[in-house]
Amino acid sequence: MSDMAERLALHEFTENAYLNYSMYVIMDRALPFIGDGLKPVQRRIVYAMSELGLNASAKFKKSARTVGDVLGKYHPHGDSACYEAMVLMAQPFSYRYPLVDGQGNWGAPDDPKSFAAMRYTESRLSKYSELLLSELGQGTADWVPNFDGTLQEPKMLPARLPNILLNGTTGIAVGMATDIPPHNLREVAQAAIALIDQPKTTLDQLLDIVQGPDYPTEAEIITSRAEIRKIYENGRGSVRMRAVWKKEDGAVVISALPHQVSGARVLEQIAAQMRNKKLPMVDDLRDESDHENPTRLVIVPRSNRVDMDQVMNHLFATTDLEKSYRINLNMIGLDGRPAVKNLLEILSEWLVFRRDTVRRRLNYRLEKVLKRLHILEGLLVAFLNIDEVIEIIRNEDEPKPALMSRFGLTETQAEAILELKLRHLAKLEEMKIRGEQSELEKERDQLQGILASERKMNNLLKKELQADAQAYGDDRRSPLQEREEAKAMSEHDMLPSEPVTIVLSQMGWVRSAKGHDIDAPGLNYKAGDSFKAAVKGKSNQPVVFVDSTGRSYAIDPITLPSARGQGEPLTGKLTLPPGATVDHMLMESDDQKLLMASDAGYGFVCTFNDLVARNRAGKALITLPENAHVMPPVVIEDASDMLLAITQAGRMLMFPVSDLPQLSKGKGNKIINIPSAEAARGEDGLAQLYVLPPQSTLTIHVGKRKIKLRPEELQKVTGERGRRGTLMRGLQRIDRVEIDSPRRASSGDSEE
């Protein structure tokens, strides 16, 4: 083995190699520098374009020319990656304040990567790039050798505004990433000025000025102020953006989409839901975007009755019409280390950078002024002694030392005198020199005054920030509008709300008819079959069936066959226990209270929603004692209503319905006491249940007789829940009861 070879453990070599690569990616590729807000490739593109003379007023040049210069001189990487970085800086929908002014196809909001090849597009720097470049040749930047040591490039650009916040950036390094959102130039400049005026400004005071991110789109930022504050306090978090829409001629028109969201992609997402019958209330989609309206997506509902606010809320939850953006304010600070910083730290550190840049610029200018004044002093000496100077120049072999010794000049002054042209020896030149000297002396005093006074330095910083904010600033584009979180609609919510009548036959066949004006008994039934029950409701309400074992089932009316046919057997849609039959059917609002009871005399109160079970096997709703049956469910209109229970033997008991417990399932509590021996022999049992308002009058039908019971007479049957009840004379076999209520005039008969 050669003596030149170095022996190194593999783990040590790989560890060092990976660490070096990681540091390179972090420091020299993925993360921006706080001073100018640029990654190295962006900085090199901007600098190379300025070196090519491609300023905002220059003629456009082929982008390939710029990319070639960047790769050949400063950035030895792939041309496609370099060009893509350049494209991003030119896209007004990607960058809040583009650095490159492009001509040709530079991509579209719908497809940012649809840009033409670099041999076709042309580019130059935008006016905004002056904020990064205008002070470059004024001693403000540190210079470093390029990759092959043949050229010098700036280590950072002397940004006049906090570009790190204005344009933001994203990048993935090794073990860390950055996601800095763009901000409004005027807001950030104003915040920086506030920090100069009052270095102890708090984060809350800054957030009164900087409202939040400002993306290059008119879509709304819907994140709450409290969450935005937390993001700027910790340097991490996320914001949500939501599309802007309005109603126009019954349709929804979307006029602004979240940042980097494609309108075509959104339409695809909505169309996919329509194909899958997830949006039955939407009839049509159109993209009417053009040059005048860059974003105009139209959603047409099926009818004017559709609640488009609810539909849009669903679309916000299920499509890119609402999008979340990660924020991670990770950047390379002035100390050369990557760190996540909060808003106060970013602006404070940038002001340190800016103050240093301005100080360097002023010192550079002061040095130039002092050099020129020094030369002007020498020239004045020459003009005052012009004849002697000419004689020395004509007669001396070495005129420079002679001039220096005769007039006490420095080498620089003597050199300047010797370089004077004869025409500059005119009398008027002396006046010009004295005028220039006077102006430069004023400038020198001014520069020295600023450099010596912190107050004057602060005033200069503020004045420059204000001037740049006025020249380059614009109004906020992304409004902040705090909104509630969007929720996707359930399948139940999506169903159209139309009146329907559900019809059940004796043999358990079911069908759905549109409308409520249906003659259910007069419909066509199978041979040997006939009408059993009908309920009216809306097509987006579930219809509930209760079987003879006390189980409940729910079906959406939209899944039922049309009433034009004879329907379908319920057993094809539900799995009933062996021997069970469907006894009751009902449709109510979700929170409607119902009385569920068995003829054994037990019952409880529940809501309609407690009955809903969308699985085929249903749910155990009411627990039945042996040989007991389910009573028809009774609607409870008001908590103050009374419950009237009537047994087969004619015993009556009335008590407040509120005495019964509210359960979601179970046996319930005893309504009326029925002796077990009589119940077993079938001699007695709960026969009828009525819920009636207080002060109701009853008309009881016994055979052909009608007996009226007024409120005061009903007091005789009022008692505690669970008692035996009262057997009133002549009322042993009650056929039916009519309720005459001061509040409700309709019949209280609950049977189907």
From Swiss-Prot:
UniProt key word Cell membrane: yes
One Pfam family name is DNA_topoisoIV
Q: Where is the Topo IIA-type catalytic domain?
A: 31-494
Could you tell me the keywords of this UniProt record? Cell membrane, DNA-binding, Isomerase, Membrane, Topoisomerase
Q: What is the effect of changing E84K?
A: Strongly reduced enzyme activity. Increases stability of covalent reaction intermediate with DNA. Confers resistance to quinolones
The protein's matches in SUPFAM superfamilies, at most eight in alphabetical order, are given as: GyrA/ParC C-terminal domain-like, Type II DNA topoisomerase
Q: Where in the cell is it found?
A: Cell membrane
Name of this chain's protein: DNA topoisomerase 4 subunit A
Q: Species name for this entry? A: Escherichia coli (strain K12)
In the UniProt record, the gene name given for this protein reads parC
